[in-house]
């Protein structure tokens, strides 16, 4: 009986020792995981949405370009038929991106908030043209400023993560 208890005790101690030896260093794995997730997000997932975003912003800014001869009606049509639908597509694309880490989710959320502010500003400009209400233009300008601030936050967050993970970011 004592022999059986001794064997059970030694076996249990050996099992506990072996389980402890197999423990992974999760901090090193987490770093690799964040690095891979950032690279996937920035290089694979985001470029399609960024292309739509850039296209919509170019349409929005065309009215303000030097030498532009668009009238307000044409500008409104461009916003309604090109820029706003393209921004909606961009928002849908970004919203559909799945991230694996909290760090990249925060990046995605900041980028998405910036794009949503620009989208709201475009809709506000259309409303201003329809109603000729100067307050709408002031609100749109405020939204654009908020969007720019959020995009700066995104760039800062991205650079911080890149520095921590040893990633080179080409701007």
Where are these predicted regions, by residue range?
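Alpha-helical segments in soluble extracytoplasmic regions
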Residues: 34-114, 122, 127-130, 134-170
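Sec-dependent N-terminal signal peptides
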Residues: 6-13
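Bacterial signal peptide processing site
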Residues: 22-24
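C-terminal motif of bacterial Sec signal peptides marking the signal peptidase cleavage site
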Residues: 17-20
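Positively charged n-region of N-terminal signal peptides that target proteins for export
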Residues: 1-5
């Amino acid at each position: 009986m004592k022999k059986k208890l001794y064997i059970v005790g030694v076996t249990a101690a050996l099992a506990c020792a072996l389980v402890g030896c197999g423990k992974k260093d999760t901090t090193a794995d987490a770093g690799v995981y964040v690095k891979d997730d950032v690279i996937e997000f920035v290089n694979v997932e985001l470029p399609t949405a960024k292309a739509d975003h850039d296209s919509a912003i170019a349409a929005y800014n065309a009215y303000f370009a030097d030498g532009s001869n668009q009238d307000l009606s044409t500008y409104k049509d461009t916003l309604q038929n090109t820029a706003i639908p393209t921004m909606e597509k961009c928002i849908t694309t970004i919203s559909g991106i799945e991230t694996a880490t909290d760090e990249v989710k925060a990046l995605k959320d900041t980028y998405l908030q910036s794009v949503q502010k620009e989208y709201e500003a475009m809709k506000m400009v259309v409303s201003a043209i329809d109603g000729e209400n100067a307050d709408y233009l002031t609100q749109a300008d405020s939204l654009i400023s908020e969007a720019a601030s959020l995009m700066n936050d995104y760039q800062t967050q991205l650079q911080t993560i890149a520095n921590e993970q040893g990633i080179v970011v080409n701007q």
